[in-house]
Amino acid sequence: MIPRKAFLTKGTGVHKDRLASFELALRDAKIEKYNLVSVSSILPPNCKLVTREEGLSELKPGAIVHCVLARNDTNEPHRLMASAIGTAVPVNEDNYGYISEHHSFGEEEIIAGEYAEDLAATMLATTLGIEFNAEMAWHEREQVYKASGHIFDTFHICQTAAGDKNGKWTTVVAAMVFVTSKC
């Protein structure tokens, strides 16, 4: 079973119960109808990245759906949290890419998102044998990766939120969702 399509999504939920908060975050991301199975970090060869709407149109409620899921939650008022998915796509579509998940506290959306993107790009770069200086800033390494001719694109999706002011559970999710076959 190799996914032929994938899409990114994100969401936030707030509720007095932790599990219900997670459910509401999945609803916000539009993936609550599926039995989600978390998988690791490989973007399959020739897997087409599509819009959330296109991907969802091929799934049916109750389907077992694989995804790379980043999840974070808190009931601490005003605590900033993030969940991010980073993706690195190789030039040669017959090769696999990388997907990373990152969840953190205290990071703004751009910081958490770029961290996840950097992580995915670095994992792909090391498997392709691209030489780079790990001490370089992400934007400098990004240029090295793309100039190598092996990495076509990198991107991320990130959801941030501050914990509910009244101490309700707040959950953030970000996911790369795979579509294996039309349900």
Swiss-Prot record:
Keyword Lyase part of the UniProt annotation: yes
Q: Does the keyword rRNA processing apply?
A: no
Top-level taxonomic group: Archaea
Write the Enzyme Commission number(s) for this entry.
4.1.1.19
Q: How is the cofactor bound?
A: Binds 1 pyruvoyl group covalently per subunit.
Could you tell me which Pfam families the record lists for this protein? Answer: PvlArgDC (PF01862)
Q: What is the primary gene name for this protein?
A: pdaD2
Family under the similarity heading: Belongs to the PdaD family.
One biological process term in Gene Ontology = arginine catabolic process
Query: Cofactor(s) for this protein?
Result: pyruvate
Task: Spell out the reaction equation it catalyses.
Answer: L-arginine + H(+) = agmatine + CO2
Task: Note the site residues: Cleavage (non-hydrolytic).
Answer: S40, S41
Pyruvic acid (Ser) modifications at: S41
Q: What class of enzyme is it?
A: lyase
Any one GO molecular function term: arginine decarboxylase activity
Alphabetized UniProt keyword annotations: Decarboxylase, Lyase, Pyruvate
Q: What is this protein called?
A: Pyruvoyl-dependent arginine decarboxylase 2
